[in-house]
Amino acid sequence: MIFPCLFQSMLNLYAEALSTFSLLFEEAKSSSEIEPDAMMLATASLEGHPSVRTVLLKKFDARGFVFYSHLDSPKGRDLQANPQAALLFLWRSLREAGVQVRIEGRVQQVLAEEADAYFASRPRQSQIGAWASMQSCPLGSPEEFQARLAEVKAMFEGRDVPRPEEWVGFRVVPQVFEFWYGASFRLHERWRYQADAAGYWRKSLLYP
């Protein structure tokens, strides 16, 4: 049977893709997955050099998928120079043989007020760590980091820890969703949702 590409309004298909992700995410949170909110984040420099790492999804809604990091980290520098990214969720325990979700899109920083609110909700020691860590810079010894932690802890003794200016939220605004449902004998099921230049979404079934 041939499945033609389906064209609908941006609102209908985007809402369908987001709802599908939401249902799978809730299923993953109720499963044996250790960190269902862990996602691979792929970025590329302005020169096209790729890199990938695992980050945690902190929020998602109709505006996109949010995570937090330092602007001066490698991913922060990539995203400032080339604000495009891909996300990948892999939940091996779901369905017959696992579920994978890929999301591609442009990236924007969240509003400072939103980042402030999330930072204020974090454990105090995590807030202190955000100030003490020079993320991805060479570290002479574990003792050096412990000394920086103690210094920051003393600096904010008796008062709230504010968000460092360079510690920000990034939102991936989806332009592509792909849902992969694993099956026996590699007869997987793959559905792709993609926005065109005019903002309309297309849904298509892919060969595995």
Curated annotation (Swiss-Prot):
Superkingdom classification of source: Bacteria
UniProt remark on cofactor binding: Binds 1 FMN per subunit.
Binding site for substrate: K58, Y118, R122, S126, R186, L187, H188
Keyword annotations from UniProtKB, A to Z: Flavoprotein, FMN, Oxidoreductase, Pyridoxine biosynthesis
Biological or metabolic pathway of the protein: Cofactor metabolism; pyridoxal 5'-phosphate salvage; pyridoxal 5'-phosphate from pyridoxamine 5'-phosphate: step 1/1; Cofactor metabolism; pyridoxal 5'-phosphate salvage; pyridoxal 5'-phosphate from pyridoxine 5'-phosphate: step 1/1
Entry's Gene Ontology molecular function annotations: FMN binding; pyridoxamine phosphate oxidase activity
Cofactor or coenzyme needed: FMN
UniProt-listed Gene3D superfamilies: Electron Transport, Fmn-binding Protein, Chain A
Class of the enzyme per the UniProt entry, highest EC level: oxidoreductase
Residues that, per the record, bind FMN: R53, T54, V55, L56, L57, K58, Y68, S69, K75, Q100, Q135, S136, W180, R190
Entry annotated with the keyword Oxidoreductase: yes
GO aspect biological process, one term: pyridoxine biosynthetic process
Pfam families with a match to the protein in the record: PNP_phzG_C, PNPOx_N
Catalytic reactions of this protein: pyridoxamine 5'-phosphate + O2 + H2O = pyridoxal 5'-phosphate + H2O2 + NH4(+); pyridoxine 5'-phosphate + O2 = pyridoxal 5'-phosphate + H2O2
Family assignment from sequence similarity: Belongs to the pyridoxamine 5'-phosphate oxidase family.
HAMAP family associated with the record: PdxH
Record's function text: Catalyzes the oxidation of either pyridoxine 5'-phosphate (PNP) or pyridoxamine 5'-phosphate (PMP) into pyridoxal 5'-phosphate (PLP).
Protein name per UniProt: Pyridoxine/pyridoxamine 5'-phosphate oxidase
Organism: Xylella fastidiosa (strain Temecula1 / ATCC 700964)
Gene responsible for this protein: pdxH
